[in-house]
Amino acid sequence: MKSTSDLFNEIIPLGRLIYMVNQKKDRLLNNYLSPLDITATQFKVLCSIRCAGCITPVELKKVLSVDLGALTRMLDRLLCKGWIERLPNPNDKRGVLVKLTPDGAAICEQCHQRPGQDLHQELTKNLTADEVATLEYLLKKILP
């Protein structure tokens, strides 16, 4: 009898490969970011908030494709670190908006500068320049 993992790999081999590459990227990113006391997941949340300016947790959940409960806990941790603030939502008396603090913007900028080219080289070290270009082209074709 085949395991669930084996069945999953047979049904969605490309999806599994993309997932595994994403996991590798996150592990590498965590290694690069650890001296700044931030995880890859926290970095993604901060970047999404930075791009939006101010955003509701529900909108952020959709952007990141994560569970709202997990996102709320993440936002609580970022709030404790002083990297975000919660503001009343003027369009919804019960809701809030999240926004980067100056410290949050600064850590986001530091994170952008830190891994950059090193991360790209580590991810693609077994590929030729032509293979990297082809991979980027094909992945962009998959996206809408």
UniProtKB/Swiss-Prot annotation:
Pfam families assigned: MarR
Keyword annotations of the record: Antibiotic resistance, DNA-binding, Repressor, Transcription, Transcription regulation
The UniProt record lists the keyword RNA-binding: no
Domain of life: Bacteria
GO terms of biological process kind: regulation of DNA-templated transcription; response to antibiotic; response to stress
Signal sequence extent: none
Domain HTH marR-type: 11-144
An MF annotation (GO) of this entry: DNA-binding transcription factor activity
InterPro entries, A to Z: HTH_MarR-typ (IPR000835), MarR/SlyA-like (IPR039422), Tscrpt_reg_MarR-type_CS (IPR023187), WH-like_DNA-bd_sf (IPR036388), WH_DNA-bd_sf (IPR036390)
Keyword flag DNA-binding: yes
Physiological role: Repressor of the marRAB operon which is involved in the activation of both antibiotic resistance and oxidative stress genes. Binds to the marO operator/promoter site.
Stated name of the protein: Multiple antibiotic resistance protein MarR
